[in-house]
């Protein structure tokens, strides 16, 4: 029976996390309750772990018109059809934001409409684009982007943080890369968490 204890504990912690609210959901709910609709928000797109806020229809149209991928820009292209369906949806929410996506570099070849328009990791560029808030997750908050993080913390105010970890753990980045977009597997990562999701911080630019 003793050999079953580790597996049992792992299952217990996994089930406990699955029943808890994800930090991305917490972040989404906080933003919609505390940040005015129509505000300009830069979402950290250095990884696939950001809250799915709704883009304004105007920016969806503008993004598609500027989306220079001939394969999808043709009248019969799948992207064109998708955008038309999206914009004609009578249930498209009115409570939307001006969303830009933070990238380390902007590629003109491998682009996705769902991550457009883009903005570089540069504070001057963010101000030029009228960004009011930045939502950063644990990849951007790690030492890999130290230079930009220092600029961000100097030029903004931290207004809210959402952490999946128990108090006192003091960790930002997970122990395993698979935890960035899915559930953790290692026992330590499971037991250290209160909920699924990444560390997320909301900054208000000065």
Each predicted region: which residue ranges?
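Signature aromatic-anchored transmembrane alpha helix within multi-pass, membrane-resident enzymes
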Residues: 1-10
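C-terminal luminal/periplasmic domains and tails of membrane-associated envelope-modifying transferases
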Residues: 10-16, 23-206
């Amino acid at each position: 029976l003793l050999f079953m204890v580790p597996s049992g504990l792992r299952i217990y912690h996994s089930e406990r996390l699955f029943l808890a609210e994800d930090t991305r959901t917490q972040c989404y709910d906080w933003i919609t309750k505390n940040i005015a609709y129509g505000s300009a928000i830069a979402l950290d797109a250095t990884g696939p772990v950001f809250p799915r806020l709704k883009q304004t229809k105007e920016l969806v149209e503008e993004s598609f018109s500027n989306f220079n991928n001939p394969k999808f820009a043709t009248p019969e292209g799948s992207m064109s059809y998708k955008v038309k369906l999206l914009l004609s949806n009578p249930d498209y929410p009115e409570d939307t934001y001006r969303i830009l996506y933070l990238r380390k570099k902007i590629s003109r070849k491998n682009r996705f409409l769902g991550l457009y328009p883009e903005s570089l990791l540069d504070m001057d560029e963010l101000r030029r684009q009228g960004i009011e808030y930045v939502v950063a997750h644990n990849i951007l908050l790690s030492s890999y982007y130290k230079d930009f993080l220092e600029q961000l913390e100097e030029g903004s105010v931290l207004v809210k943080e959402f952490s999946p970890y128990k108090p006192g753990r003091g960790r930002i980045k997970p122990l395993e890369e698979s935890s960035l977009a899915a559930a953790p597997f290692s026992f330590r990562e499971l037991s250290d968490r209160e909920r699924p999701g990444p560390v997320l911080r909301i900054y208000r630019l000065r």
